[in-house]
Amino acid sequence: MSQNAQDPAQIGEDDMGEAFGPLPVSKLEEFGISSSDCKKLAESGYNTVESIAFTPKKQLLLVKGVSEAKADKILAEAARLVPMGFTTATEFHARRNELISITTGSKNLDAILGGGMETGSITELYGEFRTGKSQLCHTLAVTCQLPVDMGGGEGKCLYIDTENTFRPTRLLAVAERFGLNGEEVLDNVAYARAYNADHQLQLLMQASAMMAESRFSLLIVDSLTSLYRTDFSGRGELSARQMHLAKFLRGLMRLADEFGVAVVITNQVVAQVDGATAFTADAKKPIGGNIVAHASTTRLSLRKGRGNQRICRIADSPCLPEADAVFAIGPEGIIDPVD
């Protein structure tokens, strides 16, 4: 690591300045909102002014003690602090150029992704078991802590595990590869195991509070849909499942917008049983339907290759062309295949 590079151990509250954007909800006290109301908002998951500005009025009214008149006042003051009107394409382009990408550990994979996992958006990884989804997540949990000039995000990682597949020993191996201190890398990963769909949603509220306090560059959910498949069964609960899933995805989108973090979600696949199956080479589709498809900015399809090799295909992206890349899973995480 270069002498000017930031040590992951030093990533913390001191680095969470105005440069990183989100304003704490307490900022509203300067504009006539009482400290008790700000505290109630924070307890309900609204830890930043941005989170309030992005929230519909009917949601604010659910906060205990917030009347309609008070909600109007809070939203009006939040709108003054957070620009949400029209801007020129030139200004938007300049903001887009400030976004960074987090390296995957594979040059082949980074090449088709334009540098790695984009911050400020949601990237979905879907595929069968043993296609490298969780291994890629483990590698990203370390590379997000690297300095920007090494392909990192200079921030911590928040990891929500729904399948009990998180293994710290994998992080230590990846850390050694990149010359990072293993203990410090583990300290910079905030881990939580989700046990049901409601708990998964509650963890997202806790994530918002943590991101308001310290600098995070990556949020991982591995996997997005496994608990929904067990908590909601049959067609009778399909509508309730999709509504709950949509609420969770909206929370992910809000965190990506507020804090500029890269959000990476993994997804399982299910076999297609319609008439089109006979004409399709790969008769499997990701779970979650259109709700997940529309929420994900970039969708990556992973499949097995020869030996430890895996193939990633860009299935959907607003700015990247469809392309394939071959990568491998090694003891030190995601790597390029060795010929």
UniProtKB/Swiss-Prot annotation:
One GO cellular component term: chromosome, centromeric region
Q: Which stretches does the entry tag as region Disordered?
A: 1-21
In Swiss-Prot or TrEMBL terms, this protein is called DNA repair protein RAD51
Q: Which residues cross the membrane?
A: none
Q: What does this gene product do?
A: Required both for recombination and for the repair of DNA damage caused by X-rays.
Q: Does the keyword DNA repair apply?
A: yes
Q: Where in the cell is it found?
A: Nucleus
What are the UniProt keywords, alphabetically?
ATP-binding, DNA damage, DNA recombination, DNA repair, Nucleotide-binding, Nucleus
**Species, as recorded:** Mycosarcoma maydis (Corn smut fungus)
Q: What does the record list as GO biological process?
A: chromosome organization involved in meiotic cell cycle; DNA recombinase assembly; DNA strand invasion; double-strand break repair involved in meiotic recombination; G2/M transition of mitotic cell cycle; heteroduplex formation; mating type switching; meiotic joint molecule formation
SUPFAM superfamilies documented for this protein? P-loop containing nucleoside triphosphate hydrolases (SSF52540), Rad51 N-terminal domain-like (SSF47794)
What PROSITE patterns does UniProt report for this protein, alphabetically? RECA_2, RECA_3
Short name of any one Pfam family annotated for the protein = HHH_5
Binding site residues for ATP? 127-134
Name the gene that codes for it.
Answer: RAD51
The UniProt entry's sequence similarity note says: Belongs to the RecA family. RAD51 subfamily.
Mainly resides where?
A: nucleus
Q: NCBIfam families recorded for this chain?
A: PRK04301.1, recomb_RAD51
